[in-house]
Structures are given as structure tokens and as C-alpha cells.
């Protein structure tokens, strides 16, 4: 069972809570059109992050620039039903960057094909600080010849950090491309304490 460590202060004593993260992906029909109901931009150590949610859970997390933030603020729509997912995401991301959270519990509701969701679920099952390659994921989902398709599904991930596509490295242990650049990838892996290791797990 994959676990989550969340530290909270109670007086001078630190309490640790471990949460199951094996079923974060909400089951949605591929034909079901789900539009984001609300969005928010907030600051993190790696830059401004845009998050979007629908009535089922978090649907988007990406890096944005200042111009995009201005457009988002002007076109913002709020929905109480989805707003709770944004608050939960901002809290958990903050804990992740402070080093007190090693996995996430916010429900995830991205749109994608069944194959893409299999790949994203395999990524979610990676432990904090754990590496894998496209080939490892293909083996994990019983599609050993679908390495390129796995790479495409990894690239189609729209919930960065939480669905940890940054943990995918080359089979030789070298860093491979990342949508937000190798420097951010190094930052995330360094935060997780594995940036200098060549560990392929699965």
C-alpha cells in the first residue's frame, strides 16, 4: 500500500498521518465532457502554479507566467462545489515543498483515455523519491511493447507534481525531457532526495 506522510504540530509534539494514495483517480467515462468549474493561481518555490478543479476533483496543475495569471484572474469563475479541491491542493502542495508531505490525497479528475489513465495510475503508485523509466511503466501495465505510447501518455499528463511525471528518467539513469524544463525537474527530484541517484524501481 502506498502511503502519505503528513506532519502536523500538536503543541511541541509532531504527529504523522499515513494515507492511502492508490485510488486518487476519479473514475470518469471517456465520453463524459467535464469542464473545469473553478481555478486559482498561487506561488510556490518553483514559480506560479495554476490549478483547476471540477465537481469531481482536481483536473489541472501547471506552471504559468505573469501574463497567463492576469488572463486567469480576468476570466475566473468560482464554484463552491469545486473550490474545496483547490484549497486542499494548495495546502498539500505547500506541505510538499516544505518537506512534510510525501504523497497527496486530493481526488484527481483528469480527462484522458483508458490507456493514459493506466499510465497515470502507475505514476501515482511510485513512492516519494522513486524513479522509473518508460519501459518500467510499460511493463507495469502489462504493455511491454508500448514504450512510445507510455511516453506520449506521460507527456499528456495535465496534473504536474501530483501525478509525478517528473520521476520518469532515462533507462540509463539520466534525466530526460520535462515539460517545464530539466532545471525544475532537478528541483523536484532534489526535494525528494533522489536527484543524484540512478535507481530504477518496479
For each of these PLM feature ranges, what is it?
Residues 145-189:
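Short glycine/serine-rich loop segments
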Amino acid at each position: 500500500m502506498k502511503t502519505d506522510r503528513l506532519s502536523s504540530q500538536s503543541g511541541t509534539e509532531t504527529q504523522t498521518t499515513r494515507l492511502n494514495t492508490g485510488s486518487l483517480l476519479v473514475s470518469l467515462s471517456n465520453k463524459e465532457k467535464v469542464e473545469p468549474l473553478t481555478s486559482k493561481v498561487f506561488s510556490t518555490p518553483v514559480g506560479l502554479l495554476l490549478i483547476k478543479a471540477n465537481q469531481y476533483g482536481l483536473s489541472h496543475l501547471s506552471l504559468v507566467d505573469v501574463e497567463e495569471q492576469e488572463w486567469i484572474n480576468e476570466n475566473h469563475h468560482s464554484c463552491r462545489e469545486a473550490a474545496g479541491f483547490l484549497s486542499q491542493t494548495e495546502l498539500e502542495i505547500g506541505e510538499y515543498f516544505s518537506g512534510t508531505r510525501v504523497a497527496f490525497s486530493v481526488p484527481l479528475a483528469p480527462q484522458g483515455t483508458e490507456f493514459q489513465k493506466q499510465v497515470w495510475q502507475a505514476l501515482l503508485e511510485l513512492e516519494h523519491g522513486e524513479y522509473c523509466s518508460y519501459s518500467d511503466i510499460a511493463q507495469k501495465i502489462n504493455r511491454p511493447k508500448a514504450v512510445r505510447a507510455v511516453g506520449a501518455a506521460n507527456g499528456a499528463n495535465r496534473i504536474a507534481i501530483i501525478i509525478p511525471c517528473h520521476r520518469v528518467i532515462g533507462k540509463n539513469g539520466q534525466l530526460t525531457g520535462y515539460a517545464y524544463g530539466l532545471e525544475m525537474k532537478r528541483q523536484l527530484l532534489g526535494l525528494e532526495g533522489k536527484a543524484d541517484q540512478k535507481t530504477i524501481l518496479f
